[in-house]
């Protein structure tokens, strides 16, 4: 058994020449003599050839030896490892076991082979070597034990819980443990998430009078950062300072200490460590810049970046520029982005692809997707990341059609779609509510057998937004409890809310809690709109309390959702209180509050908050302008609204969308300036060919009794009716005819709707009782007590038809009610 070969997989193809080719090439300098293991210079020659980076020549020399000794086997194995060919090193070990069973392996053989196993992460081979050394090597040295520990640490993953103790067992079997063994053990505990134990073992090492090395601190600092104790961090860092310059000047230790304090949220201490470092390399600079970026100290990160590139002592690398690009992206300032782009271009003869990709991301996040596309088009060479970056930029900026076209072009250019491309495709399908593209993408995933983390949540979200909630439900139920992660639960909750199934929203939320899946900010932000839909402030308050207990109420998305919920539920005072208590505000928070003011007819407050938002340095986006224009419309602030509309185009360079045009049309129509609204829409030309825009105009005609204009608008709307359900507009026109008692016209409209197969959308009502939501649809029979409910309704209807009740009713004009 001891002499059996390793169970090795086939090696990857060598990027080396065949022996015959090499023999020809080196014929002038090398002709293998007849060698024996006793040739004095053979080991040194073999070692020298490997050191010179010519492992193929070393192999030819080794193959010429009839019976290599253990020392020569060790030399060739180590030589191939040093030349980054660990797979081939393992093959030499296997060959040694097969062809030279009587050649004894020593400590160097095993330690070298175990190193090759660690580098290839070949656990099966590593275990085989472990068995070999147990059978063949009676007294393993510390070098072998250290290599064995390192192999297991490298090959085992954190989830391999059944082999948690194997590293510890090897460690405990060592008679004399040096600092290398302790370091490996500490790193293993950190890797497997046992950070407290890692810190404890460091303390035991100190008590055993084993002096820690710089690597000891590099390994233990990440464990200290997880402890959330700055006091403990100060103790470990203070110990490192006491040990002297060898540790203080070690730049890996410095970088690790900077990261440790940053993870604890103590940025000032990170900066103190950085400033105390006299000789810094680029890794130390990058670590400190990265700390600033990750903690949103964006101005400081850019200042430090400028200081780094201005230093004559160091040369900035790609990571430095990537970190700076991330900072500029987060600041979302296009002008700063342009300056950074120009600066980077001056510092590189030819920009590396990775930096060009980061420039595309930067422009995209600054809201200048056309600049991103310009960078993309200027690239001489693109990789799959370049294509995915540009596709994602289009989708994230609302240019979903352009993103889809680029996917098609990407395939034409010979690039394969990966999971990142698929996520962009699914997002585009969700945004466009395009179920066909979504289904095709889903089918592609199934055909290609592609699986990636979060795939189910993307699919559920896509089908939900496309109105195919039943398919979403099937995917959710088919996944099983074990496979459902937090994102999957959130997608299903959000899907039910978006499709108006509020009772199922709360049902899934309860099941989520029962399965001990901890809700996060996305969960709460997804479920709060359901409270708005049923108008339940009490249920909203319960969720507000839940978010406070879970420390989620100050999350910017949860805070915005709470403001929105209270506003839509009619509790505008609660919405104001929530807004004022929110410490961190972004454009979403402001937009939600502005929208709330608008819905409650508080247009002046909405405009005041809009101005306050601008003064605070938060740039309003397209949605913010929709909110403030809506507020002006609801409050009749026409002049103010038109002024803001012009400001949007000229100052913020935001191109109006159909929603902005609808706001202006509605704004003019509400105050009776219907003809002016009509001229505005007509003047838009091709941009005005939007059903919602003309539908808004039709609503204004209904409000002010402009029947003649309504007929003109209806004719225009009919041109948009390409198999879509525009029953709402038809009903509106029919009701106008009914008010004018033009019954023939009413009948004509109804007949036309029936011929088209149009139906009035069914009304849906909900009521929350004792924490449970009961939903009702017109003529619904699904409720278990529907017969009793309809009996009560019939009784109420009879009472309402009584003489005493009818005398209190005003005279009304009949309106169109279609059969459901």
UniProtKB/Swiss-Prot annotation:
Against PANTHER family, the record matches this protein to: PENTATRICOPEPTIDE REPEAT-CONTAINING PROTEIN
UniProt gene name:
PCMP-E95
GO BP terms in the entry: chloroplast RNA modification; mitochondrial mRNA modification
| Listed name of the protein | Pentatricopeptide repeat-containing protein At3g22150, chloroplastic
Signal sequence span is none
Pfam families reported for this sequence: E_motif, PPR, PPR_2
> Which segments carry the PPR repeats?
69-99, 106-136, 141-177, 178-212, 213-247, 250-284, 285-316, 317-347, 352-382, 383-417, 418-452, 485-519, 520-550, 555-585, 586-620, 621-651, 657-691
Q: Which GO terms describe its molecular function?
A: mRNA binding
Q: Which portions of the sequence form the region Type E(+) motif?
A: 771-801
Q: Which domain of life is it from?
A: Eukaryota
Q: Which InterPro entries match?
A: E_motif, Pentatricopeptide_rpt, PPR_At4g14850-like_plant, TPR-like_helical_dom_sf
Q: Which family does it belong to?
A: Belongs to the PPR family. PCMP-E subfamily.
